[in-house]
Amino acid sequence: MDVVTKVSGEVTAHPSLRTPVTTYGRQVRYTVYEFEELLDSSSINAKGWAEIAQTVFQNYELFDGFVILHGTDSLAYTCSALSFMLQNLGKPVVLTGSQAPMLELQNDATDNLLGSLVVAGHFMIPEVCLYFNNKLFRGNRTTKVAASDFAAFNAPNCPPLAVTTSMRTNVNWDMVHRPTSLEHFSIQTNLDTAHVACLRIFPGIKPEMVDAVLRLEGLRGLVLETFGAGNAPSGQDNAMINVLASAIQRGIVIVNVTQCKFSE
């Protein structure tokens, strides 16, 4: 039996499981812990991310790595959030899911789960990663690119950290993050995502539309998705620029990002 500490501090016992013998001649020993309240991934928010981060923190000294099973709809968002919440990480945290459930005859769940366990159990990759369709991606570089295809995720501006073949897992060690200092692992769970909005610029958008978003009650930040290298329509008499300038003067933080998948 293995012990797992809940966020509340309660210690619970769980069966100790093992994978089949891997290509490396070893088994990965693991235990399964399930949250008391299961959540559809499309409904996750900062509270759910905090619960995951706190669970990793409570059990950090008990395990050599962590595999987190997660629905695919918001999987890339959770990976990105955890990569900033889990600070000074010194162990692998691998998130995965599936496009088809394990009970289906044709599914990707088994390969994704076993592949994640092999990565977390054999390789010291101290990052929050996403494992899917035999590829290991840096968590905060991934995005979902397919609604039903097994190759559901990609990282357009970052090569995979590892690729699994029928023989072994090939790690691109030059890409793996290596800590430059020995700091104690900690978590940051003080998130305020509820007061940040995203707005995608499109041809013909009116400054009044942008202004309406920027005047939402309690808004503190806006991620503005613009054309190309950061371009947006200025509007008649620079109306769009005036709307953005007014919001900045009111203390709203505006971040300009490109809509393009690839950039320098």
Label every PLM stretch briefly.
Residues 95-168:
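Internal gly/pro-rich beta-alpha loop/helix module
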Residues 27-28, 61-65, 88-92, 123-127, ...:
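Short coil/turn connectors at secondary-structure junctions
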Residues 1-58, 262:
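ATP/NTP phosphate-donor binding region
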Residues 68-91, 234-243:
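Short Gly/Thr/Asp-enriched flexible loops that form oxyanion-binding sites at enzyme active sites
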Residues 224-264:
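C-terminal non-catalytic interaction/assembly regions of soluble proteins
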Residues 1-24, 138-236:
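Accessory alpha-helical/coil subdomains and C-terminal extensions
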Residues 68-70, 94-97, 129-133, 200, ...:
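Short beta-strand segments
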Residues 60-75, 217-231:
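Short acidic, glycine-rich surface-loop motifs adjacent to enzyme active sites
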